[in-house]
């Protein structure tokens, strides 16, 4: 293992790198926010540095589910190889737009030659890049979507060249009929899979060790919380003073987002807040963009980001539409700026490993499946940079969060009276399991119902039924916090308007999360 690389990794990342040196196949399961991307980079870079010492080079492939994620992985890999002064060639294989060269030039080591980075789906161009790198004995790092991976594979098969290290990010997407042929790639000398949410299934599920290899490293969300790698969730259940239906909620969506924002600011007043909104689909986002609430928030200085594959939404920021890589850079820049307030609305695309710092809360408008809940929660579970430094210095601890800048990830849910409060109950159960049992997020699926995603495919829209797009119902007033689960072991009740059923639930919460004797 490279000694310089060893010094910059956190202990759990170093454990993962050590595990990869002992095996040629395997799965790494770590919660969102724990730095899986840097583990992947470390595995690839360690092999690159070893070959460099022997005047050799190799081919390194990183597979991702989305075009947007590929640009982020490229930037982080590029930054690390330039810090280590390793001249590498890069190739992006998917149908997306060109890269942001200005952003990469800011990271470029002047002692290394600059070479333009192609974004292509042409096998001829892929072949040219592979042959150039081999001729000049330079490592080639290919970052591609699962949807386009077959193009690179066909070129390497034609040239009879192996992949030295293959890294499958968000590998749960390989558990599909479309991408299953990529699981056990015999042309890869080493192949490792990374996920926060394992998927089990017959024949090709991640429980099939003969195809995926052993689980080389598993960290539960609870363990990550206890080790100070991510912050714990704090659940906020909101409701109105009167009963309302889903139609009322749909009509009042923008108003409720505005109130979620106000509530988060009241609860989390140590920082400039950043809230991620998990919507039900395009209609929610499109209606919000046009709403007076969005205009008011922008006038107040809040940075509003909305993203979707549908042209009605696109990559929207404060009234303007941007190219996706530029939109992501703007979001990351605002996310990293402690002085800026941010609200970001999405349906699914930000769930898949997009690393945006700063989110302190996430608001759900539907009950996601377990893996989607963990991914969205993970977007807001990253440590504040000041807390990370204070933990290193021993100034704060994980068992006393009073002095933390960001002690929790605030998870906001909304009770739907006409469907028996199923959303808040479902998410509460997920949080309970995460806190109490340190579960490994896995989901069993029936493979006949699962196919791969296209790199540009519009995800399922919960409002795609035309009959559901008619905005009916009444506007909801007097939105309030009903109760909040304050920490792993205590429940704080912030309102006394409860009926008999609620009192039973509250009693159960107090029994479950009451102080330990």
Locate predicted features.
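Conserved pre-motif I regulatory segment
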Residues: 1-29
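Walker A/P-loop
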Residues: 23-44
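Conserved Walker A/P-loop ATP-binding site and its immediately adjacent core
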Residues: 39, 56-81, 85, 89-98, ...
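Conserved helix/coil segment N-terminal to the catalytic DExD/H
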Residues: 123-162, 177, 181
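Post-DEXD/H (motif II) to motif III coupling segment of the RecA-like Helicase ATP-binding lobe
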Residues: 172-233
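Conserved interdomain linker/interface between the two RecA-like ATPase lobes of SF2 helicase motors
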Residues: 214-286
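A conserved SF2-helicase RecA2
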Residues: 224-231, 386-491, 495-499
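Conserved RecA-like P-loop NTPase helicase motor core
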Residues: 311-441
């Amino acid at each position: 293992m490279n000694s310089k690389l060893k010094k910059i990794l956190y202990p759990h990342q170093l454990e993962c790198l050590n595990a990869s040196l002992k095996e040629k196949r395997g799965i790494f399961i770590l919660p969102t926010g724990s730095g899986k991307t840097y583990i992947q980079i470390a595995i690839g870079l360690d092999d690159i540095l070893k070959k460099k010492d022997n005047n050799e080079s190799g081919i390194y492939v990183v597979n991702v589910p989305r075009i947007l994620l590929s640009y982020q992985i490229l930037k982080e890999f590029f930054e690390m190889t330039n810090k280590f002064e390793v001249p590498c060639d890069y190739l992006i294989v998917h149908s997306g737009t060109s890269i942001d060269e200005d952003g990469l030039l800011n990271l470029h080591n002047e002692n290394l030659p600059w070479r333009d980075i192609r974004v292509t789906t042409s096998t001829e161009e892929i072949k040219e890049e592979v042959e150039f790198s081999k001729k000049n004995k330079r490592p080639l790092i290919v970052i591609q979507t699962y949807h386009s991976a077959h193009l690179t594979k066909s070129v390497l098969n034609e040239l009879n060249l192996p992949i030295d290290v293959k890294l499958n990010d968000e590998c749960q997407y390989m558990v599909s009929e479309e991408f299953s042929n990529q699981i056990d790639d015999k042309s890869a000398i080493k192949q490792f899979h990374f996920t926060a949410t394992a998927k089990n299934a017959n024949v090709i599920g991640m429980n099939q060790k003969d195809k995926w290899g052993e689980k080389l490293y598993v960290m539960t969300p609870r363990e990550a919380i206890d080790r100070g790698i991510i912050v714990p969730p704090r659940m906020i259940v909101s409701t109105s003073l009167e009963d309302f239906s889903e139609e009322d909620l749909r009509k009042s969506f923008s108003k409720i987002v505005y109130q979620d924002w106000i509530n988060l600011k009241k609860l989390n007043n140590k920082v400039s807040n950043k809230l991620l909104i998990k919507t039900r689909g395009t209609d929610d986002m499109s209606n919000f963009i046009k709403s007076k609430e969005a205009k008011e928030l922008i006038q107040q200085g809040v940075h509003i980001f909305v993203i979707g594959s549908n042209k009605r939404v696109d990559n929207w920021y404060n009234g303007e539409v941007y190219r996706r890589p530029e939109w992501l850079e703007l979001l990351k820049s605002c996310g990293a700026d402690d002085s800026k307030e941010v609200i970001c609305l999405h349906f699914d695309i930000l769930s898949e490993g997009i690393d945006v710092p700063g989110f302190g809360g996430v608001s759900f408008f539907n009950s996601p499946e377990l893996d989607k809940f963990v991914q969205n929660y993970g977007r807001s579970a990253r440590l504040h940079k000041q807390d990370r430094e204070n933990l290193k210095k021993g100034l704060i601890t994980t068992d006393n969060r009073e002095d933390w800048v960001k002690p929790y990830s605030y998870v906001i849910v909304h009770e739907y009276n006409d469907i028996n409060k199923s959303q808040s109950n479902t998410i509460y159960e997920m949080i309970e399991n995460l806190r109490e049992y340190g579960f490994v997020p896995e989901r069993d699926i029936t493979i006949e119902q699962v196919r791969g995603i296209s790199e540009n495919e519009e995800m399922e829209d919960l409002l795609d039924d035309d009959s559901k797009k008619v905005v009916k119902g009444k506007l909801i007033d007097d939105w309030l916090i009903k109760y909040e689960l304050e920490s792993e072991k205590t429940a704080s009740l912030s309102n006394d308007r409860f009926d008999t059923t609620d009192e039973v639930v509250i009693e159960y919460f107090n029994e479950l999360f009451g102080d330990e004797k």
